[in-house]
Amino acid sequence: MKITFLGATRTVTGSCYLLEVGGHKFLVDCGMFQGSKLIKALNEKEFLFHPGEIEAVVLTHAHVDHSGLLPKLVKEGFRGPIYCTKSTEELCSILLPDSAHIQEGEAEYANRKGMRAGKKIVEPLFTVDDAARALHLFKLRSFGEAFNVVPGVTVTFRVAGHILGSAFVEMSVTEGDKKTRLIFTGDIGQPNQPIIEDPAVAGGADFIITESTYGNRIHEAYDKEGELANIINDTVERGGNVIIPAFAVGRTQVLLYYFQKLQAEGKIPEIPIYVDSPMANRATQITMTNPEEYDEEARALYAMQGRRLVSMHNLRFTATVQESMAINEIPGSKIVISASGMADAGRILHHLKHNLWREDSSIVFAGYQAEGTIGRRLIEGIKRIKIMGEDIRVNAKIYNMKGFSAHADKQQLLAWYSSMKEVPKAFFVTHGELDAAMELADSLGRNLGTATYIPHFGDCAEIHGTEWQMHESEMVQVEPAAIDLRAYMRGMEHDYLLQRSKIEQIVARNPDKAVMVRKKLEKLHKYMDDILKDL
């Protein structure tokens, strides 16, 4: 058996694993790269396999960094089944067509500009028709149901507790007289999240392909409901708006659950709450109609409210672009939840444009912000940012509420692995930026006394029973993190030129500041030298 790592290697997005067993090929996940423009460009590269030779896909959950390239896979010849849970299929039915609309729109925009410059016509990465054909291939399997993927390979989905429908994959592989047990974690949720059940206890495996999104972090143990209430109350007192970039699937529904609870307890005022994302609207409806995946508390609330999980008179779902734009014309404080969660596309850009410059407004991030995204730049303290072609000063208060993460942290992952009956032979650490992957790998080695490996793009693990060896990729492939660093440094160069011009203008008006500015720049220069010495 061979496992080739074709995404989420030393980065968080693009999950894709190619498995070869007894002459049969199948994938676990087929995700899209997300982040900066240079990282997104990896989606344009050819697959390192022939899609027509892939016999099946096992899909852990609906998030596009795990499912987003399925339409491209179908476009290029894949015709096999895509196995997933019921809720995952329902969520993909909104996520994949939406992603296809974006691809078509970006291609149309590029072609309008390109025609004037005489450039070659750009084809979309995939189309809405490709997404529809991909969805037609989905085959539903229940949690706990064992099924065959290809000869010799049996898979069972277990509750991952990340988002609705999310699963980790228990896999049994038989080759001749050799048997191997594998676990692909997908994304493991942190315990005690609202609405959905906690991750199930895994039965054990010889090898685990693990995520490491928060492999170097411990979620803060604090009263996040109280903090959310404080932010809302402070913002309302200032007369501003609370703008929340939120993932349409999972995070939006959790936030609504909390707002309902805080309102019922009288801890926040009943100001208008807008969910301004057609995708989030549909995802909320899907969440409402799958109570079998709720935890005990959510089931009780669902029954008490007449088979409705969320019921607030001040909650509004906007559908049209006109309704979305009208929100910013409505006087008074309001809460706006909009996508995308990393603020790099979608209607949220419109709300950021209208609120970032306002000192009375608050921007609340309640999820992971990948390198290169607008969300990441805002939580890192950027003072000016370009949104929708307009240079905007950041005056609003920026909050980064990490406690809402749908990913388990390092301690929670270690506790989950420790609950297994036996220690695996090795962990392959993926789906995390390099520092996170390295820290989790180190902790796994020290705490469990097992081997760990952090694959590069294209690396291949060859496994025979419980024996394994790695074959490092000979491909010339730049790591996504390195691509993103290059883009970030280009941004630094651009900012430096602007800053230099401003400094020269300031000193021209105030020559007495020249000495002070020189001393500060000398300190900065020395700091940069020290950074290079540490590398």
Report residues per predicted region:
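Active-site-proximal loop/helix segments of hydrolase catalytic cores
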Residues: 161-166, 172-175, 179-205, 212, ...
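Cap/insert and terminal regions of metallo-dependent hydrolase folds
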Residues: 168, 191-276, 362-365, 385-454, ...
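Metallo-beta-lactamase
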Residues: 99-163, 291-330
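Active-site metal-binding loops of divalent metal-dependent hydrolases
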Residues: 8-9, 30-33, 87, 163, ...
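Core dinuclear metal-dependent hydrolase active-site scaffold
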Residues: 1-52, 133-197, 322, 326-329, ...
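Pre-active-site segment of Zn-dependent metallo-hydrolases
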Residues: 9-11, 21-80, 84-134, 188-197, ...
